Amino acid sequence: QRNIMTKKPFNPTTDGAQTDFSKKMSYGDYLHIDTILDQQHCLSEAHDEMLFIIQHQTSELWMKQVLHEMKAARRALELEDLPNTMKMLSRVSRILEQLNNQWDVLRTMTPADYTQFRDTLGMSSGFQSYQYRMIEYIFGNRNANMLKSHEHTPDAYNKLKEELARTSFYDEVVGLLFKVLDGNSIKTPLLQLDVPHEPNAEIMARWKIVYENIGEYWSLYELAEKLVDIEDYFRRWRFNHVTTVERVIGFKRGTGGTSGVQYLRRMLEVELFPELWHLRGEL
C-alpha cells in the first residue's frame, strides 16, 4: 500500500507573508482599489451596462498611460535622448495593442443587449473623451474645432489649448530630421501648431534620404519606424471602433450627435505621420 503524502494548504503566516496591515500600507491602499471599484455606477438594470462602463473606464486608464509616455518621450526627444524616446514609443505601441484587444470583449455585447441601456447614456459619447483628443493633439492631428465639446470642463479645455500652443511630438521629430540633415532646425512656416499636419514635400524629401541611407541615419530610420508602428496600431484601434459600433447599432446616429459609423469611417482617413506612409511609394 502506497503512502499518500497530503499537501498542507498554504498558510501565509507561517511562510512569512505579511498579514497585519493595521500600521502598514497594503496592496489595496497603494492602488486605491476601493475607490476604483466604487466608480461603476450603472443607470439601468441592464446586465451589459457594467461591461460598457468598465470597457470605457479601462480605456481611459490606458490612455492616461499613453499620455504619460508620450509627454516623457517628447521631453527625451527635445534632449536628443533617442534610446529613452524609443523605449517609450515601444511601450505606447504595446498599450495601443492592448486597447485593440479590448474591443474583442465589448463585441460580446449584442444589439439587443445595448438597446436595454442606450437611452440612459444621454448625449455622452466617446467623441467627448478629453484624453483621446489630447493623444491626437500630441501626435499631430490638431483640429481646434474639436475644442468646443470640452468647454464644459475648464481644466480639460485649458490643457488642450496649452497643447495646441506647443509643438507636437511629430513636429519635434521633424525638427530633429532637419537638424541632422540640414544642420539647422525646420523653418517655422512649415509648422502650424493648431491645424492637422498635412503632407509636406520638403519633409518627405528628407525622410526619403533617410530611408535610402539607413546605415548613415539609423537612429532617424528607427525613430520613423517606431512612429509607423504607433500609427499602425492607432489605425487598427479606430477601425475596431468602427466595426464594433456598426455591429452593435448599425448606422444609427451616435449618442453624442455625430453621424455614428459614417463619422468614424471619415476618421479612418486621418494620417498622423503622412510623409512616412507616402514615401513608401517613392522608394
Summary of predicted features, one role per range:
Residues 5-283:
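Surface-exposed peri-terminal alpha-helical interaction modules
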